[in-house]
From Swiss-Prot:
The lineage of its organism: Bacteria, Bacillati, Bacillota, Clostridia, Halanaerobiales. NCBIfam families: PRK01059.1-4. InterPro entries: Arg_Kinase (IPR023660), ATP-guanido_PTrfase (IPR000749), ATP-guanido_PTrfase_AS (IPR022415), ATP-guanido_PTrfase_cat (IPR022414), Gln_synth/guanido_kin_cat_dom (IPR014746). GO terms for cellular component: extracellular space. A motif (RDXXRA motif of the pArg binding pocket involved in allosteric regulation) lies at residues 335-340. This is Protein-arginine kinase.
Length: 349
């Protein structure tokens, strides 16, 4: 596969597309947890039960007619292909691990994914670029309604939608945004902001969800609970907090230009120099340097590189994407070399 093919055909819309506040908010995500009534949850289900879930879901999605979805059986994919789906945020790391009955449904531009037999029978996700929580919710809600016409979801009048995880009981809704906050980090305000978020019913994770590290100044902010709040309330709260975070990040960027312009320009250009000339580079270092360069582009320090290229590289430099591009398994050192080559090539395209 050529670099051009990988970029043009294998980048999800949330990476390559445009959206409101895109310089700070990389993506908006809505995820709904649903289970079929009378069938055990995946962690207690046998092979036949999981196959029955898959059969019912595929039958329901094929009959809804409005949204074209393609089914992928996880056991049919080699490990690197499963990891590519994780790196594109289309499936969870847990879903990529070997196990019977697992599958995923995707639409053409990968804004919609439905994991089958993950922690719940269905994890329906809509992922789009920029701050578009309402738009993502509208799409997710429409598909949820279409599926509920064909499937009997486990639902309690008292508790709402039932889930294998207590924190998902209620609406089953997890709304999240992925944000790039380098200036808050550079002005030493990031910990204060993260602490404030936890006090308003939200949580902050790394870019791959629970248990993942913060890298490249990227943070995933989402609601903590789904019980006792309507979907609109959850989304409105997250959007309001995100808007405040955006404003704080913009103020921090202005402060840096006003009080530390030389230091910021030096950091940005040093990072660009490393990315442009490194012979090998680790994923962690590359993400740090890309974060600095993206900040420089967004602040007008670098003017001859499209900020979209930086967003693309944040995905393309991951281990599975590099190995898919090369068409073979790579050692860590080989990945570091190929990562440096890819970055140099892409920055000069």
């Amino acid at each position: 596969m050529s670099l051009k093919d990988l970029i043009n055909k294998n980048l999800s819309h949330w990476v390559a597309g445009q959206g409101p506040e895109r310089d700070i908010v990389l993506s908006s995500r809505i995820r709904l947890a649903r289970n079929l009534d009378t069938i055990p949850y995946p962690n207690r289900a046998d092979k036949d039960s999981k196959e029955e879930v898959t059969k019912r879901v595929l039958d329901a999605t094929s009959k809804q007619g409005k949204i074209k979805l393609h089914y992928i059986k996880m056991d049919d994919l080699p490990e690197v292909e499963r990891e590519v789906l994780v790196e594109k945020h289309l499936i969870s790391p847990a879903h990529a691990k070997a196990g019977e009955g697992k599958g995923v449904l995707l639409n053409d531009n990968e804004t919609i994914s439905i994991m089958i037999n993950e922690e719940d029978h269905l994890r329906l996700q809509v992922l789009i670029p920029g701050l578009q929580l309402e738009g993502a919710w509208e799409t997710a809600s429409e598909l949820d309604d279409l599926l509920e016409e064909k499937l009997d979801f486990a639902f309690s009048q008292k508790w709402g939608y039932l889930s294998a995880c207590p924190t998902n009981v209620g609406t089953g809704l997890r709304a999240s945004v992925m944000v790039h906050l380098p200036a808050l980090n550079l002005t030493n305000n990031i910990n204060k902001m993260l602490g404030a978020i936890s006090k308003v019913g939200l949580t902050v994770r790394g870019i791959y969800g629970e248990g993942s590290e913060y890298v490249g100044n990227l943070y995933q902010i989402s609601n903590q609970v789904t019980l006792g709040h309507t979907e609109k309330e959850i989304i409105a709260n997250l959007k309001s907090v995100t808007s405040q975070i955006i404003e704080q990040e913009r103020q921090a960027r202005n402060l840096l230009l006003k009080e530390k312009e030389i230091e910021v320009r030096d950091r940005v250009n040093r990072s660009f120099g490393i990315l442009s000339h490194a012979y090998q580079i680790s994923s962690e270092e590359a993400l740090r340097m890309l974060s600095n360069v993206k900040l420089g582009i967004d602040m007008g320090i670098i003017t001859d590189v499209d900020t979209g290229v930086l967003s693309e590289l944040m995905v393309l430099i991951r281990p599975a994407h590099l190995q898919k591009l090369e068409g073979k398994e790579l050692t860590p050192t080989e990945r570091d070399i190929k990562r440096a080559e890819l970055i140099k090539t892409r920055l000069n395209m």
